[in-house]
A protein has these predicted regions:
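Bacterial Sec-dependent N-terminal signal peptides
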Residues: 1-23
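Non-catalytic cap/lid and distal C-terminal segments of serine-dependent acyl enzymes
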Residues: 22-80, 84-389
Length: 389
């Protein structure tokens, strides 16, 4: 197995480089015979032609020059087996794929690898390839628009006393941040399980979404802190009994952001939201840990949210027991999901809190599942309601 893995890695090291170097032999002709009507995926690295997408059929095409390989499979996430020509070029054609972003892996002779032709993305707890099956003009809200002002995404580290180590965040500031002394509300935004704080930028395009919405007058200017939902546990890093990531956010991160950026440092101008597990961490931080005095806006994007008629008065530390108090403290409870997500129980849970008298706004992304296109659409609906006076 070790020999197979080393061989696969050596072969993959040539992909995308072999034909680019002056004086090197050219790759077989099949590598430059592109399928009619296809275009390179927007997630491809510079000068890489594969994977390619047919916008009409939504099929994806992959080619690899791996003459010594015996089998090549691409998983998107279903498995598609490749065929090999006499020159050693493997071609893989998928079935029609749903629009939106998808992680994928390449398996060469049993060794699962990340395709070096695309940028690397963190998903399923692993580094994966990524492919974007494009929407039509309806997807322009999350695309880069050269005609609108653009904010910045800043990469920072901060020290967590709670965890005894540094932690990484990405911070979006709107285009106007550098031009004046204005102060801004802050959204703290979480990823889901198996992903990290890069996801909302690289896969979700939250910066492009806000650039476009702010320019169109559809969203308030805001700072967005994209943070990690995980804690580090090693012999050299402090594991404080009873402490969670919620304590890190409240005790370490919020003070750091208020000190570092021009924020409006009060609950009325502070929000928290997250997708999937990050939605559960949002309810845990704001409701279970009784931090409604620090956050007034909440967004759960396919977030863990299990509420029934029987437990509505006791769940989340009894946060819903007094609807009048809750509605006064939480300016927005926004719950969203994809229509094809399966039995997560979102409609029933929302109905239970609404029956209790809790103000709850819902949004359903039609035709999407537990995926980034759902969360892009959901974030857009959430953002247009956020920090409205």
């Amino acid at each position: 197995m070790k020999k197979t893995l080393l061989l696969a890695l050596a072969l993959f090291a040539t992909i995308g480089l072999y034909a680019q170097q002056p004086g090197r032999p050219q790759l077989p002709k099949a590598m430059t015979e592109y399928e009619k009507g296809t275009k390179p995926s927007e997630t491809n690295r510079l000068r890489q032609e594969y994977p390619r997408i047919d916008p009409q059929t939504r099929k994806a095409y992959f080619k690899f020059y791996l003459p010594l390989a015996h089998s090549v499979t691409v998983s998107v996430p279903n498995d598609f087996k490749g065929t090999k020509d006499i020159d050693g070029v493997w071609t893989i054609e998928t079935d029609p794929l749903p629009v939106g972003f998808h992680y994928y892996f390449v398996t060469v002779d049993g060794a699962r690898l990340t395709d070096p032709n695309t940028y690397a993305y963190y998903g399923y707890g692993l580094t994966a390839g990524g492919i974007e099956v494009p929407e039509g003009p309806e997807g322009n809200y999350y695309r880069f628009n050269k005609d609108v002002p653009h904010g910045q995404v800043r990469s920072l580290n901060y020290y967590s006393k709670t965890n005894g180590t540094y932690r990484h965040i990405n911070v979006y500031v709107p285009a106007s941040y550098e031009t004046g002394k204005k102060r801004y509300p802050v959204l703290y935004l979480l990823h889901g399980s198996g992903e990290n704080e890069e996801g909302w930028i690289d896969q979700g395009h939250v910066d492009f979404i806000l650039d476009n919405m702010i320019a169109a007058g559809e969203a308030q200017e805001m700072i967005v802190v994209v943070m990690s939902g995980d804690m580090r546990y090693t012999p050299d890093i402090r594991d404080v009994p009873g402490k969670t990531v919620s304590d890190i956010y409240v005790d370490d991160l919020v003070p750091f952001i208020d000190k570092t950026f021009r924020t409006i440092p009060n609950r009325e101008n502070r929000a928290m939201a997250g997708l999937s597990r990050g939605g559960g961490q949002t309810t845990s931080t704001v409701l279970d840990n009784h931090n409604m005095d620090k956050f007034a806006w909440m967004g759960l994007l396919s977030g863990l949210f299990r509420v029934t008629d029987e437990n509505v008065k006791t769940v989340f530390g009894g946060a819903f027991a007094d609807p009048a108090t809750f509605n006064k403290q939480i300016r927005l409870l926004h719950i969203s999901w994809g229509s094809d997500e399966g039995n997560f129980g979102f409609p029933a849970s929302c109905a239970a809190v609404q029956k209790q008298g809790i103000n709850c706004v819902t949004f359903v992304s039609e035709g999407t599942a537990h995926e980034w296109l759902t969360w892009r659409r959901s974030f857009r609906d959430f953002a247009k309601r956020l920090f409205k006076k």
